């Protein structure tokens, strides 16, 4: 436990056994809160930090987006891929005065840190797990900006820009109605309480995950590592791939996918009926693929009606046909929902 998780527990949050999730109410109430403005402790995410004069060069040579051109007040979606172009990690990367930091799924953080450390060699960069000193808070909804101001943040003027207040509270604008706060652990509780006092409802992990699903912003977790090329997760559509930078692990596959042939899989937003037993990595089936998997669920979140919404990587032909089932060829049938952006 940390000062941050202790504060959440005293506020009435129920923490998961591994302290990687939190809830403030039952699943239905939490899902309903996502229709308003919410403040969420992002315990399912963790922060890594890269510090040193070679931070930009080091990361630029390893990830899918352009780190060298990331401004001091910038943030970007990014990914680290296997040599076969499959995503090992997806994350939000931002600049810091002495290097960079990134937020990724906590369940892959230790292994990912070890993997990255293998590439350091003579680079003047130090990698560290920053979870002990940095807490992440998500704000989403129509009054998210007001909640961020209430928490003591300075508002960025554009999407994927960031500001830092005097108390060290970093505010990254993901969209006009969606912000990520990175706060020192010692003051995160006060920032969270202030955001709630400014009109946000304290909500749990599932509420944020539902908001991310509705925003079409996927997250690689342990269950989906090395399953997808970046474009299958719509990563170039949300600004997570730069096709003009130099080489990085998997770059040839990512580029070939972009410029040669037709992309056969995309990420879709889907609805699952109540009672469906499924999670990240669950296989999807469609008549045009028979007993063979036609896709996988990526992220899943409960909804207020007892069902679920999810992001799913799916064969485009199967999505167009419209008959896709979860977990087995005769499993529950899912339905397609709109994404907030077009699938190019």
What residue ranges belong to the model's regions?
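Short glycine-/aliphatic-rich beta-strand segments at the starts of folded cytosolic domains
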Residues: 41-62, 128-145, 262-273
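Acidic, proline/glycine-enriched N-terminal capping motif
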Residues: 1-77, 81-82, 86-88
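Short amphipathic beta-strand starts and helix->beta connectors
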Residues: 26-35, 78-90, 120-123, 160-169, ...
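Glycine-rich, small/acidic residue-mixed loop/short-helix segments
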Residues: 4-8, 233-241, 255-344
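Acidic, low-complexity central loop/insert segments
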Residues: 38-39, 46-47, 92-215
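Short, conserved active-site entrance elements at the starts or edges of catalytic domains
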Residues: 205, 211-236
